[in-house]
Regions:
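Composition-driven recognition of glycine/serine/threonine/acidic- and proline-rich low-complexity segments
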Residues: 3-204
Length: 204
């Protein structure tokens, strides 16, 4: 199920809150979580949660949907190539989606997947969440997280708000793929507890 197939209202919500064109990309500065100050515990619990983010969005909302923005062959960003365990692989696909809670985009996700792995394992992925495949296959090994801060304007959102994201590497045999996720303004990750006034010490 995709958000844009549900009804016209949801499409209007997308145009207001997410107005970027595929491929959006994430040419940002990634850091270890220990090198930044995460503003509050609620955000920390989303950023560093090692479980399935898809399942967390599903459990935190009454209506869940996945919007496939696009998937195509693309040269990864330099910061993506430096993370990938390149083993003779020269062709990758970029896949970008929105995870939607209650008819609103909560998470932007970008995955960089070796073409050979797409051909052998993921050729029929379509609208299915990639996380469903990854977390149901015990063969995958996940790396530690890196985090980033990115302006909401990169996603066509008319706001000066700073958004937080994370990425990790999933490895299976000789294949390595990047899964990066940015929490959009409507995501519950930003609903900090009352009385919390801890501010990030890091800037974009």
């Amino acid at each position: 199920m995709t958000c844009y197939h549900t009804n016209r209202f949801i499409i209007r919500v997308f145009r207001v809150s997410f107005n970027a064109t595929f491929p959006v990309g994430l040419p940002v500065n990634w850091q270890a979580p220990s090198d930044v100050t995460i503003p509050h515990l609620q955000l920390n619990s989303w950023l560093l949660d090692t479980g399935s983010l898809t399942e967390r969005v599903q459990s935190s909302s009454e209506h869940f949907a996945l919007e496939l923005l696009g998937q195509q062959t693309q040269t990864p960003h330099s910061n993506e190539l430096s993370l990938l365990l390149v083993n003779g692989e020269t062709s990758y696909q970029a896949r970008e989606i929105l995870l939607c809670g209650d008819h609103t985009p909560w998470v932007f996700a970008r995955s960089i997947i070796p073409q050979a792995f797409v051909d052998s394992e993921l050729s029929n992925l379509g609208q299915e969440p990639l996380g469903k495949r990854l977390f149901n296959d015990a063969r995958f090994i996940r790396s530690a997280f890196e985090v980033c801060q990115v302006s909401a304007s990169q996603f066509g959102i008319h706001s000066n708000e700073v958004l937080w994201g994370r990425r990790s590497l999933f490895t299976l045999d000789s294949y390595s793929m990047i899964v990066a996720e940015v929490f959009l303004p409507a995501c519950p990750a930003y609903r900090q507890p009352a009385g919390s006034n801890i501010q990030s010490e890091k800037q974009l």
